[in-house]
Design a protein with these regions (language model features):
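Catalytic cores of nucleotide-sugar-dependent glycosyltransferases that transfer UDP/GDP/TDP-activated
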Residues: 1-165
Length: 165
């Protein structure tokens, strides 16, 4: 509640990301769009696009949307984060983004592996929005709920690959 990090948040977000993807597989869902909400989901885009999941038939056509909030934490995840993450896969280039696991670096990495970004709240760090634009990501700007909902639905329609089987 005070905004400080738990010492094991690195393991928690890894467990969460892997848990979500393994649950999807177990339930035999094949998502067209995976929408990640908030910093705690920041590893999902990496897992879907750069680890063993990228070649998994459940995820190889999935698009990833990341919603950004004004939920920045101070400090960084533990120093051993990158060592633990390397076990999951990726390349030297991928790991560079996670060398210093601050909020900004985690979210920039998440943006780089996402197909689109939604600014879901006022007060989102402008550096993240600028990073998304510079990396040619489709960005849905913050708007009142109904307006933004319509834009997100249109985004889903534009990204989704419908399997007719």
């Amino acid at each position: 509640a005070d905004g400080s990090l738990f010492k094991d948040n690195d393991e928690r977000i890894m467990f969460y990301a892997r848990g979500v993807l393994e649950t999807i597989k177990k339930l035999s869902w094949k998502p067209n769009v995976i929408h990640c909400v908030g910093w705690f989901t920041a590893l999902l885009p990496f897992y879907v696009k750069r680890t063993e999941y990228k070649n998994n038939p459940f995820f190889n056509d999935s698009k990833v949307v990341l919603s950004l909030f004004n939920d920045e934490f101070q400090g960084a995840l533990v120093e051993t984060f990158l060592k633990k993450l390397k076990v999951e896969g990726g390349t030297q280039k991928d790991w560079k983004a996670y060398k210093e696991p601050t909020y900004l670096n985690l979210m920039k990495a998440a943006i780089s592996y996402s197909d689109a970004v939604v600014v879901a709240q006022e007060g989102v760090n402008q550096e993240l929005i600028d990073f998304a634009i510079a990396n040619k990501k489709q960005v849905i700007d913050y708007a009142p709920f109904e307006e933004q909902r319509e834009k997100i639905n249109a985004l889903y329609d534009s990204l989704a690959v419908i399997d007719e089987e």
